Structures are given as structure tokens and as C-alpha cells.
């Protein structure tokens, strides 16, 4: 009886293993790792508008475009064969459902709440360069020095980190060419 019980458990474990392995492989295939260690990601923020500045609560709301650029040789393609010089994944459906490769999930540490995602676009170039842009409205907390108010000057900061990756996997670099603001 004991032997039969042990064999039954062994069969159950083997069956679960056979079923779980393809699932695990499918999950790994859908969410691959960064292309290299470390993967360098150039990041910049275009500030389109400062919507609100709250000195009392030390926060500010902005409309921004977050831009990230990296190289993933696994995505390289022959432009002539494909009939296009770039592959574009635009909008939440194409980005979330059609594009299945790795991208750096960027988290703003001092963001209050969830913010509004208004647009997303990911472009893959023939050499494997990838450009990601998302337009969002965010509320950010930052310490303010108000001693000279109303003649003060403030540095409004956003702290961006790669979510879900260790520093050995993804390194963010500020790209001044991607860091801008409107003149208004």
C-alpha cells in the first residue's frame, strides 16, 4: 500500500513537471531578459507642460514624454526583405499585445499615484536599435527650498529607475539630447 501511494505521488509530480515546464518556457519566451549584461539604456524626458506647482505640498504636475533608447541585436532585421525601414508598435494594444520582446520598464520613484498614460510608441530599426516613447501626465513629489519665496528658483526632479532589473542587468544613462522642455 505504501509503495503504491509513493508511486502515485511520483506520477503526480512527474505529470505536474511535464505540464509546468512548457508553461514556464512560454512565460520566459514572452518576457525575455535584457539583450546583454549590462544593457545601457539612454533616457531623457521632454517636459511639454508644467500643469501645476504646489509649494505647500512640495509637488508638481507635468505633462511629459519619457524617451528611452537601447540596442537589442536580437531584433535586427533586413529592411529590404521586410519592406520597411522601421517596425512601429503604437498604442496600448500594439505595444502590450503585439510587441513581445524585452523593454526597460521605467519607474518614477517620486511619482504620487498612478498618473495618466496617454500614448506609447516603440520603434525598432534594422540594426536592432529601439526607441521607446510614452506621453504621460504625472504628479511628482520633490523637496523645495522656499526661503526666498516668491523670488525663489526650484529644481524639480524626477527619479527614474529600471523596474524589475538589477544594476548589473540595466544601466540608465541620461541623454542630454533627449532631455528637453518647451520654451513656454
What is each PLM-predicted segment?
Residues 1-5:
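N-terminal secretory signal peptides that target proteins for export/translocation
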Residues 6-7, 23-25:
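Extracytoplasmic entry segments of secretory-pathway proteins
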Residues 9-20:
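Bacterial N-terminal signal peptides
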Residues 25-184:
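Soluble non-transmembrane domains of integral membrane proteins
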